[in-house]
Structures are given as structure tokens and as C-alpha cells.
């Protein structure tokens, strides 16, 4: 389309299993950024440039990994589908439709996105829901008409406190869970402190801008994220039920929106994928895989709706989405080899 080229590549084999590999070729940067900061490799073996790790290096990892399997004569698969998404960063109906269609043609998916440090992979991701809560009341003069008005902001304030009750408790004081604070305490952050269910009232407003006027309208926009499908559904029902919880007579609450994208859950099939990758890393490289959970979304959330999914098997990257993003090229060969060996094993044995 006019935003990029969505490329779907297919390899036919002689086996029974089909895998969907997903990477992306777009970046968060505007056109012309590469001319300002062209690709370069420094003396320490780090590559630099816009999108160098998210997700350019990993796009190449897949190509070299598949080339190695082909050179080795590996054909124990039904089909390998490799989709490079041109609109992953911003999302689009085009990309989401392609991912959904291809997922239903495969037995499992591997999302080739940015890896976490020290053999880190992502085994769970939160799902995403969005809501708009609109309160309609009756406005009027605060001094003379309070008795015949209905304050929409007061009702919204109550509704927001009810929203807050749906969220999981925070692990402690915010200042104790920054990257620096965890590092100072000798704790490796792998997302383990992310609360299971989070509710964020990110936007709030009213047409009223006078404190002497009782507001007749108010609204807020809410983002909800959960690690589990069951919890996502539970919160969805609870939020929609807030329309019936009126504490200010004369007001009406309307809740619109709902679940947008489901979580990427860690199922028994996903655990098998993790076990295979962990064995490969240990046996071939003497490494230990670190499992991460993430509150952000990737195409892995969309494939997980249909098939077991493992995420973030790319090359190790630092400071993505910034002008100092870099890739540790020393991880390229080990990561590519581990990916290829794991892929071959999963295609031979299946994931269920």
C-alpha cells in the first residue's frame, strides 16, 4: 500500500508442520532520518542507525537462518511462511488482516522482534483494551441552581475511583522500581514487577471551563492491559457495568469501546517452544535463557489468538526508538544459529 511493502515469502518442504515467522521492516522514524544518521559499525562491534535493531538486524537474522537450513538440506517441514510487516510500529487494518490470515495457515508462530539482553526472550505479553466513558448531567449556575443540576464531573470522579479498584496493586513505591533503583539493588529486570492488570485513565475532559458553572458533561478515555484472557474478559464486563453505577442523581453514564487485542499467553505449547530454545542455547552456547514478560504489544499478540507463539528471538538491541539505538553484532551469529536450530527441531516434532 502507500505506506510500505508487505512481503510474504514461502518455502515448501516435505514435512507436516507449518511455521509463521514475523518481522517488520518499518521504523518509528520519519523519512530522511537514514540520510542524517546512516548505518555504521563502530570499533566495538555495535551497529548504529535508525531502526538498526528494531527490526532491521532481525529481518536479516531470519534470512541467514533460513539460508543455513536450506544449505544443510533441511526439508522436514510443510511450509515456512515469512512475513515482513511494513506497518508494525503504527499498526494498520492491512497488517492485522495479513497476520490473522497467515496465522490460520500455520501450526505455530515465532515473532522475530527485538531480543532482550543475555539470551532474553518474551514469553508473555499483555492484551489491550480501550474505552471512552461519557457522563451526561445537567449544567447550571453553581450559586443559584445547584439544587436542580447534576454534576457530570462528580459522577465521573466516582466512576474513575471504581476503575482504579479493578487494577492490580502496585508492587511498592514508584521510585523503588526504576531501572536505576533495581540495578542498585542487584535485581535483573525482566518485567516481573509489571502488575498483572493495569488501568490507565489517560485523558479526561469537559466542555465546561468555569468553576462557577456546574458541568453538564464530562468524559475520560481509558486503556486497560492484562496478561490473561480470562482477566481481560472479567475487566471488560466490570467496566461496562459501570454504566449502571450512578451516585449523582440526574446523570447518565455511557461506556463505549472494549477489547482490542488479546494477550499473548504462556500455554503448554508455548512452554514446549521455550524448553526447546532453552536446550539449544544451553547445549550449543552454554547460555541460560531469560524469560521476560512485557506490557507492550507486538504481532505476537495477534498470532497468539490462533496459534502458539514465541516472541523476541531477534538480535540483541539497545535503546530502540531513539537516536542512539544500537545492535550488539556479537550476538548476531549465536542468536541466528539458536533460532535456526530451534526452528528445525520444532518443525520436526511440532509444538503440541
Where are these regions (language model features)?
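Short, conserved micro-motifs enriched in small and acidic residues
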Residues: 47-60, 89, 150-153, 326-333
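Acidic/His- and Gly-rich active-site-bordering loop/insert found
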Residues: 1-52, 68-76
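Fold-independent oxyanion-binding glycine-rich loops
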Residues: 23-25, 52, 85-87, 112-115, ...
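Metal-dependent amide/peptide-bond hydrolase catalytic core
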Residues: 114-115, 123, 129-352
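Short coil/turn motifs at secondary-structure junctions
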Residues: 14, 26-28, 87-89, 138, ...
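A structural signal for isolated positions on well-ordered beta-strands in alpha/beta enzyme cores
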Residues: 20, 81-83, 254
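Acidic/histidine-rich catalytic neighborhood of metal-dependent amide-processing enzymes
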Residues: 55-128, 179-192, 347, 351
